[in-house]
Amino acid sequence: MMENFKHTTVLLDEAVNGLNIRPDGIYIDGTFGRGGHSRLILSQLGEEGRLLAIDRDPQAIAVAQTINDPRFSIIHGPFSALADYVAERELTGKIDGILLDLGVSSPQLDDAERGFSFMRDGPLDMRMDPTRGQSAAEWLQTAEEADIAWVLKTFGEERFAKRIARAIVERNREQPMTRTKELAEVVAAATPVKDKFKHPATRTFQAVRIWVNSELEEIEQALKSSLSVLAPGGRLSIISFHSLEDRIVKRFMREQSRGPQVPAGLPMTEAQLKKLGGRELRALGKLMPGEKEVAENPRARSSVLRIAERTNA
């Protein structure tokens, strides 16, 4: 039975405004979650508008299925496959906007049974879709110490990655960890210097979650796919919550806004330059949550919204 965990959508109005909704447009909410963005998009669409929502979390799908609206459809799957979903519906190049709200949601964090949080004891799972792939416990029990250390360093920016990885492997040899509390305790014991403002397991849990769900690869693939999916003038509106996510989004928008880089002085005809193509996107800037939103929803503090528009190139 699914409990009703509270979820406050971050940068709700700003992210939807970033799509520049047309009443008859076709939009994608790639991270349905609990439907905050989707419901606002639907409220701005006319009868001819359409909204395609995507989520890989079965609990999110259950919520989406309660929306009885002929303009709305939900897909159970990763947003990295959005180009396939669009192609199946013969909508390639016709999408007027894509919204992505990256990372883990409040209901996922707050539900101990999902295994995302070191603050609540539950099964050491961390999968966005619990029906697919390895759980965090399974991966930590089979991975090499060097691989665990690399994940903690790369995706958690954990300075004590090697020490923590060694402690995890040693603990799993004695008795395999299956609970979030066990992992949090092992990490805390292996961390020689504590940050008084942050739990010692914060970075480890983030890193393992990102790895288990292939989160950064998912983002990169979705961004790449957006170029073929969006119509000219179509918008990308993307919310990220930590520097690794935001770095990928920022770099993609910057690179696609530049167009092909030609070395200075290289002799090229006008026809050759045209063949290289122009800018794919026009970056429209970024927004951060205001003081009022952060006060009402502390989890919004680290969020960044970046918006870009597909060019006619």
Swiss-Prot record:
Function, as annotated, reads: Specifically methylates the N4 position of cytidine in position 1402 (C1402) of 16S rRNA.
Please state where this protein is localized. Answer: Cytoplasm
Q: What is its EC number?
A: 2.1.1.199
* Source domain of life: Bacteria
Q: Which UniProt keywords apply?
A: Cytoplasm, Methyltransferase, rRNA processing, S-adenosyl-L-methionine, Transferase
Q: What do the Gene Ontology cellular component annotations say? A: cytoplasm
Which residues of the sequence carry a binding annotation for S-adenosyl-L-methionine?
G35, G36, H37, D55, F79, D101, Q108
Per its UniProt record, what Gene3D superfamilies does this chain match? Putative methyltransferase TM0872, insert domain, Vaccinia Virus protein VP39
| One Gene Ontology term from the biological process aspect of the record | rRNA base methylation
What is the name listed in the Swiss-Prot or TrEMBL entry for this protein? Ribosomal RNA small subunit methyltransferase H
Entry-linked InterPro entries: RsmH, SAM-dep_MeTrfase_MraW_recog, SAM-dependent_MTases_sf
Q: Which NCBIfam families match?
A: 16S rRNA (cytosine(1402)-N(4))-methyltransferase RsmH
Q: Name one Pfam family in it.
A: Methyltransf_5
Q: Which GO terms describe its molecular function?
A: rRNA (cytosine-N4-)-methyltransferase activity
Please state which protein family the record places this protein in. Answer: Belongs to the methyltransferase superfamily. RsmH family.
Q: Which organism is it from?
A: Salmonella typhimurium (strain LT2 / SGSC1412 / ATCC 700720)
Q: Which reaction does it catalyse?
A: cytidine(1402) in 16S rRNA + S-adenosyl-L-methionine = N(4)-methylcytidine(1402) in 16S rRNA + S-adenosyl-L-homocysteine + H(+)
